[in-house]
């Protein structure tokens, strides 16, 4: 309720979601003088986002998330949202670093590449654990994801997701091997796809930038379109 009050003081409208219905009386009291704040008691991960967005103008998401839903919630907006302008969320600091990581670093992973196709990511502020009571076991950070239309264009969002998943299937294996396994390609097909995307034969997935992964996904999409035996 505290965050919602602050948002209501500066925003025209605030649509808040809370999963715990036991908080209804507390929030009713806390937000009694905030007529522009509307609280829906529902698990946001089960909300029909497309239906919700049909009723909304472009918006910003602000949240202090339970850490266990951070990735699925962020990916909902990355994969489904048409109107989110930005996400400003507090997350574990190691998760924030993964959101913002560069290719080839230990923090760089599938979620980094997934986010990068739609949004830029930056750490706005680090929040040490001593700022909370009771003191948690981890530090936190406020991270901002800013959505940009066609930030990294791809021919198929699904093929990009499949390519990212394949790239990080196993960090110990080459991307060629991962493509063979994930896309059911012959080794020759995998090599041809890598060559067409200007990716070295022995490259590992975690060394490719999101733009390189997008190029590779377009090549793989063209193979699918030509009805090469790659399962959908």
Placement of each model-derived feature along the sequence:
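An accessory alpha-helical subdomain
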Residues: 141, 145-147, 152-190, 197-200, ...
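Generic structural signal of hydrophobic/aromatic residues within well-ordered alpha-helices
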Residues: 111, 190-193
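Catalytic cores of RNA-modifying enzymes
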Residues: 1-162, 206, 215, 222, ...
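Amphipathic alpha-helical segments that form the core helices of the histone-fold
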Residues: 195-202, 213-219
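S-adenosyl-L-methionine
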Residues: 175, 204, 220-222
């Amino acid at each position: 309720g505290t965050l919602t009050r602050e948002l209501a003081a500066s925003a025209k409208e605030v649509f808040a979601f809370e999963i715990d219905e036991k908080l209804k009386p507390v929030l009713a009291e806390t937000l009694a003088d905030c007529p522009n704040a509307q609280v829906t008691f529902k698990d946001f991960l089960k909300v029909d986002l497309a239906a919700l967005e049909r009723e909304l103008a472009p918006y910003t998401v602000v949240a202090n998330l339970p850490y266990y839903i951070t990735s699925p919630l962020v990916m909902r907006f990355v994969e489904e949202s048409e109107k989110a302008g930005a996400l400003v969320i507090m997350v574990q600091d190691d998760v924030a670093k993964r959101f913002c990581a560069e290719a080839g670093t230990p923090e760089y992973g599938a979620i980094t590449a997934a986010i990068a196709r739609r949004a830029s990511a930056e750490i706005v502020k680090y929040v040490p654990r001593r700022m909370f009571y009771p003191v948690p076991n981890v530090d936190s950070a406020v991270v901002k994801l800013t959505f940009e239309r066609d930030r990294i264009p791809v021919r198929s969002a699904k093929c990009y997701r499949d390519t990212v998943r394949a790239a990080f299937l196993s960090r110990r294996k080459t991307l060629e091997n991962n493509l063979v396994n994930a896309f059911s390609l012959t080794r020759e097909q995998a090599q041809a796809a890598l060559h067409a995307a200007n990716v070295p034969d022995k490259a590992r997935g975690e060394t490719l930038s999101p733009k390189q992964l997008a190029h590779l996904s377009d090549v793989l999409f063209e193979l699918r379109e030509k009805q090469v035996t790659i399962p959908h």
